């Protein structure tokens, strides 16, 4: 990303990176604010440090942002990547279905095992898996860098708490278990990391630069970028492609630059695109062929139809996964002479019908509908006399759990007291 928010993050990142001893020159580091709606940050050798706009927006002061970036630089300074037993893994930062279908989420079920084999698409960014000891060492190094830079070292504990709270909120929104978030975690649980970081930081004073931080990130895009499509509850709309569809009840959507994942307790899926030569039946066969490198997926037959005036074709393959049978469905739409989109879904045998409403909901949106799609943005506001948690939360651009979202975004609790003149973050259109 470019712009004032990216420039601000770059400045903070370089200031904390030079505390690592990797280099004393700020110019030796490249700090990038990524246009992603996922909470993540990472660094790689060579002075490259990355943080997503979504994670930056979760911070509540500059010290917290510096702590996150310092933690990631700490991994590089301690040469954790070189010490790992396995090489860097390609993990979905932007919603790839491979992660959604992994055994980490689905366990050893037939659905989970087959999902690990056949789905590997979606947009990805490099993230690194570290051991428990390495994560703890990076936390400690981040705290050291905060102290050297004059920041309040306790910021490391507060940002870890915010991440744990965001993770719990995400799980509640999705109706899933409280999965440990990618950045917050790899092995140590967030609660223990919060306690350890607070103990390590001690009572050393330092600045937080809250006002500078809030001014620096004010106006940043929050959540999905319309250029990549917008998820609003169970509805996905892409103004560029003039497309919209509705996920089935009980399913949630995760958006990415190249794939939209659909996940629920009884099935998973994604919407993606592939090279299209003008023949939908051939397209469906090609998608099936590309889904698995370990076993051949052949649909029983391919049928053609129309959905809301859009030419479509679909097929189903029943597969033995070892723990039972599953159905894999590919449902494709001709969007133009050289463009097609398709759903790929997986569910236990006989349950693929739960996706029928989604397949039939695909439609082209009008120009006016496309124009009406607006991004959510972070807005820093000043609390006025008479404002309450409830009144401010009601201004959030969400219909689901606005209060919970407001509290997590601002690091507050339901018992927090507001004072006139205090600044808080809102998400607005």
Q: Where does each model-flagged region fall?
A:
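Extracellular LysM carbohydrate-binding repeats and other cell-envelope/extracellular binding modules
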Residues: 400-429
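Secretory pathway targeting signatures of secreted, lumenal, and periplasmic proteins
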Residues: 244-289
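N-terminal "mature-domain start" segment
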Residues: 225-256
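Primarily a LysM-type cell-wall glycan-binding module
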Residues: 367-400, 422
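Peri-catalytic and regulatory segments of divalent metal-dependent proteins
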Residues: 1-106, 127, 141-178, 182-183, ...
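Surface-exposed amphipathic alpha-helical segments
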Residues: 66, 251, 343-375
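Short, hydrophobic/aromatic-rich segments at coil-to-beta transitions
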Residues: 229-236, 260, 307-318
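Signature of long, low-cysteine stretches enriched in small and polar/charged residues
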Residues: 289-337
